[in-house]
Each structure stands twice: as structure tokens, then as C-alpha cells.
Amino acid sequence: MGECFFVNTPFPFRGIDFFPLSDYTIPDTWRKAHIIWREDGKMVYKWDVTIPKLSGDSPRRAYLWLPEDYEENPDKRYPVMYMFDGHNVFFDEDATYGKSWGMAKFLEENPKDLIIVAVECNHEGNRRLIEYSPMTYTNSEHDTIRGKGGIMLNWMVKELKPYIDETCRTLPDRNHTIIAGSSMGGLMALYGATAYNHVFQRAACLSPSLWVAPGKVLEMVARAHIRRDTTVYMDYGELEMFNHAATQESMISTAHLLLTKRVNLALRIVPGGSHCEASWEKQIPIFMECLGL
């Protein structure tokens, strides 16, 4: 029950290549990564990874947030949340449009027993759409997007997650593994929670791009074996929801199907909300609470 791959792509990778960015020495095997120090001394680690099947040897940035008491409690283990569009998660200076989710600031002000791992997307052309789609579809410019989301999730589940579990003090079981994202990343979070439900018990899907291929999204959810302890948070901003009929229809149909599968679904329309990082930032405390974090 729960072990279903909607896209069962053979996993071709043999390891993650890590590119050191500085000469800092980090405890617990995080060697030679770039440390971003916050005013109160907390840290976000940055390093580069490659995903050969998706982007060859081109590096992309990965981010790791460790809880404030991580070094003080060497026997303590933590849940892990994996996030998409890692460059938009923590810092405005790294964000595509100059505004991030502000996750570092939130966690400094609201400490959580939680490790966060976030990997940057592919910025080249329409590669983000390709890597963050579990299915093939035609976009608004009539381009065919041949989705490689299955390859991306396989990399996360079979390469990135084992590396994090080996090098950090995680709670590696399904009950303590969460996936989150927004827009196309929100679609991927839903994909993770359904097709990879044996790995991810909880998901935060903010403004998920269900509309790109609504029929295929519904098929993805319908075919998945989802355990009844699964929790999914899904929201849309008021401004994006009521201006797009396709978004409304996709949300209602997907929510109905999730409920028929007895998923613990938290569904919200955000008053005044729109499709942007500034809006998603405001939802952090809400989805964290809904997911029991």
C-alpha cells in the first residue's frame, strides 16, 4: 500500500558530485561548503551539485538549513523537508526576482526541529518546466514540454535523500519526510506525495501548476496508492484563483480526488494572495502548522 511509481523511470545515477565553494571545515562531514552566517550565528550551508541525466556537468546550488540546537544536541535527530526552487527559499539576494520566501528569517524567529534541503532549479530556457513536470504537455506558447519530473524525483529520492540521511542526523523514515514547493514546484510536491507516497508522508503545494495538464494530473493522483495518514496542504492566492477558470476547475477536481483517497487535505484560498514569493512567504507559518511542524 502506498508504493506506486506513476513514472517508473530507471535511475541512472551513480553518485552526486559536490563542488566545494570555500575552505571552511564543517562538523558532521559537511566539508568545505560555503557557510552563510546570520546575525544570531545560525547557518545555512551552500554547495553545488550536478544532476547528470538532466543537466550534465552543469552545477546548481543546493542549500541546507540545520536547526539552531543541532550542534548542541549530538544525539538528537530531525525530520527533513525537501524543497524545490532552492534559490528562492532562503535569501532575497539569491532569488530570481529579488524576493525569496524568507525561510531563513522565519526559522530564526520561529525555531523548528526541522532540517531543510532545497535545490536550485535549472534556469536555462524552459528547462525548469521540463524538470518540474511529471508529464508531457503543451504550454501556452504551444511548445511541447516533455516532462522529466520522474528523473528529478528519482534523483532526490535515490541520491540526494540517502546522502542527507548519511551525513546529517535525520529521521529518515516516511513519517518524518516532507516535500514542498510552489508553482511548478508545487506540482512536483504533489507528485512526490502521491507517486512517491512511500517516501513522503506530508506535502506543501503552494499555487501548484495543476492547470498545465489537468487530465494527466488527475490520472497521476488516481493511479497512486496513497496511505490514509498522508497530509497535503494546498493553496492558491485569491488573485490567481478567481482570474483563471482553469485553475479553479483543476483545484476542485484534484481536491475531490484526494479526498476520495482519504488524504488529510488542508485547502485554502489566500485572501489577497497572488502567484509570487512575497505571497508564499506569508503562508509559511500556516502550512507548517498544517503539516505538524
Language model segments and positions:
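N-terminal amphipathic/hydrophobic targeting modules at extreme N-termini
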Residues: N8-I16
